[in-house]
Amino acid sequence: MMQSATVPAEGAVKGLPEMLGVPMQQIPQCAGCNQHILDKFILKVLDRHWHSSCLKCADCQMQLADRCFSRAGSVYCKEDFFKRFGTKCTACQQGIPPTQVVRKAQDFVYHLHCFACIICNRQLATGDEFYLMEDGRLVCKEDYETAKQNDDSEAGAKRPRTTITAKQLETLKNAYKNSPKPARHVREQLSSETGLDMRVVQVWFQNRRAKEKRLKKDAGRHRWGQFYKSVKRSRGSSKQEKESSAEDCGVSDSELSFREDQILSELGHTNRIYGNVGDVTGGQLMNGSFSMDGTGQSYQDLRDGSPYGIPQSPSSISSLPSHAPLLNGLDYTVDSNLGIIAHAGQGVSQTLRAMAGGPTSDISTGSSVGYPDFPTSPGSWLDEMDHPPF
């Protein structure tokens, strides 16, 4: 079955007789002019058809025949594409073609003619010494040293202070809350928003960080100072309480010592060997020790076999006058047969003798020559003695 086709005008198909009988829907349209392409040659870029006269660079309008570059639906020549989307010069912010010779300083890239001092505009060559600023600007060594000398000479003069408005300060504070140490692109954005120089923004953040650090340090020092003051105050109050308690009692150290000596003198002789002799009303010899107060509790500090102990004798201690001080009135001598003899002094009318005698006892150690041991059984000599009544 044959299909009829509409034949286009003769002027439109002049030179293209092979297209007779082809539907118009199958003829491609140009991406540049949106018309059907009836030319002998058709250009195709990224699945899009072009007239040979419509394929041009979007920037320089030069017709593209051999090679082209596309970005976001537009086509460019090589030069314009790298100028627009390639690496940009740090000084002029223009793109750098890949075939062009460039200069590099750290991470910054420059055109040859842009690699120059910002003060004298002298183009820097290979081997020249220069200073690189933080924002990428270049200063030759001679101009930098000259500017530094001028700054040193004018250091005595007061420099004008930078005034920051309330709106600018609010913007900087909000940025500081987000990041106390912002990156370079953030500082550039803040500089453009506030209208301040980039160096001023950087110095403001540095001063802000230093202030926060100083405040934290001062707060910690203040807390420790309060702690030390409280400890010192508590120690002082405890010392005052002790002094006040001593004052309330009304007794000094000298008075207390005097009273102790007086009490000891009133009690009599308090030697460990003799026990409490001043108030003896009745005594009993128990296992080589004196009864301290007549209640039956013996003084157990004497050791068996000690040459300085009281020998175990059947004699008892006679009653002495009560409340007679013995510390200053007794004179002790040693007799080879009688043991220890106390001569009478002030307030003493009798002689204290510790008698010794009897055969060797089985409980004795025989450590002393002048003190004979007692017999084995205490009953052999205890029954013969008349004890004073208690």
Swiss-Prot record:
<dbReference type="InterPro" id="IPR001781">
    <property type="entry name" value="Znf_LIM"/>
</dbReference>
<keyword id="KW-0805">Transcription regulation</keyword>
<dbReference type="GO" id="GO:0005634">
    <property type="term" value="C:nucleus"/>
</dbReference>
<dbReference type="GO" id="GO:0006357">
    <property type="term" value="P:regulation of transcription by RNA polymerase II"/>
</dbReference>
<keyword id="KW-0242">Dwarfism</keyword>
<dbReference type="InterPro" id="IPR050453">
    <property type="entry name" value="LIM_Homeobox_TF"/>
</dbReference>
<keyword id="KW-0371">Homeobox</keyword>
<dbReference type="GO" id="GO:0030182">
    <property type="term" value="P:neuron differentiation"/>
</dbReference>
<feature type="region of interest" description="Interaction with 5-mCpG DNA">
    <location>
        <begin position="199"/>
        <end position="211"/>
    </location>
</feature>
<dbReference type="GO" id="GO:0000785">
    <property type="term" value="C:chromatin"/>
</dbReference>
<dbReference type="Pfam" id="PF00412">
    <property type="entry name" value="LIM"/>
</dbReference>
<dbReference type="InterPro" id="IPR009057">
    <property type="entry name" value="Homeodomain-like_sf"/>
</dbReference>
<dbReference type="GO" id="GO:0043066">
    <property type="term" value="P:negative regulation of apoptotic process"/>
</dbReference>
<dbReference type="GO" id="GO:0043565">
    <property type="term" value="F:sequence-specific DNA binding"/>
</dbReference>
<dbReference type="GO" id="GO:0006915">
    <property type="term" value="P:apoptotic process"/>
</dbReference>
<keyword id="KW-0862">Zinc</keyword>
<dbReference type="GO" id="GO:0000977">
    <property type="term" value="F:RNA polymerase II transcription regulatory region sequence-specific DNA binding"/>
</dbReference>
<dbReference type="GO" id="GO:0001890">
    <property type="term" value="P:placenta development"/>
</dbReference>
<keyword id="KW-0440">LIM domain</keyword>
<keyword id="KW-0804">Transcription</keyword>
<keyword id="KW-0238">DNA-binding</keyword>
<dbReference type="GO" id="GO:0021526">
    <property type="term" value="P:medial motor column neuron differentiation"/>
</dbReference>
<feature type="region of interest" description="Disordered">
    <location>
        <begin position="356"/>
        <end position="390"/>
    </location>
</feature>
<comment type="function">
    <text>May play a critical role in the development of respiratory control mechanisms and in the normal growth and maturation of the lung. Binds preferentially to methylated DNA.</text>
</comment>
<keyword id="KW-0479">Metal-binding</keyword>
<feature type="domain" description="LIM zinc-binding 1">
    <location>
        <begin position="28"/>
        <end position="87"/>
    </location>
</feature>
<keyword id="KW-0677">Repeat</keyword>
<dbReference type="InterPro" id="IPR047956">
    <property type="entry name" value="LHX4_LIM1"/>
</dbReference>
<feature type="domain" description="LIM zinc-binding 2">
    <location>
        <begin position="88"/>
        <end position="150"/>
    </location>
</feature>
<keyword id="KW-0656">Proto-oncogene</keyword>
<dbReference type="GO" id="GO:0008045">
    <property type="term" value="P:motor neuron axon guidance"/>
</dbReference>
<dbReference type="GO" id="GO:1990837">
    <property type="term" value="F:sequence-specific double-stranded DNA binding"/>
</dbReference>
<feature type="region of interest" description="Interaction with DNA">
    <location>
        <begin position="161"/>
        <end position="181"/>
    </location>
</feature>
<dbReference type="InterPro" id="IPR001356">
    <property type="entry name" value="HD"/>
</dbReference>
<dbReference type="GO" id="GO:0008327">
    <property type="term" value="F:methyl-CpG binding"/>
</dbReference>
<dbReference type="GO" id="GO:0045944">
    <property type="term" value="P:positive regulation of transcription by RNA polymerase II"/>
</dbReference>
<dbReference type="GO" id="GO:0000981">
    <property type="term" value="F:DNA-binding transcription factor activity, RNA polymerase II-specific"/>
</dbReference>
<dbReference type="GO" id="GO:0009887">
    <property type="term" value="P:animal organ morphogenesis"/>
</dbReference>
<dbReference type="InterPro" id="IPR017970">
    <property type="entry name" value="Homeobox_CS"/>
</dbReference>
<protein>
    <recommendedName>
        <fullName>LIM/homeobox protein Lhx4</fullName>
    </recommendedName>
</protein>
<dbReference type="GO" id="GO:0001228">
    <property type="term" value="F:DNA-binding transcription activator activity, RNA polymerase II-specific"/>
</dbReference>
<dbReference type="GO" id="GO:0008270">
    <property type="term" value="F:zinc ion binding"/>
</dbReference>
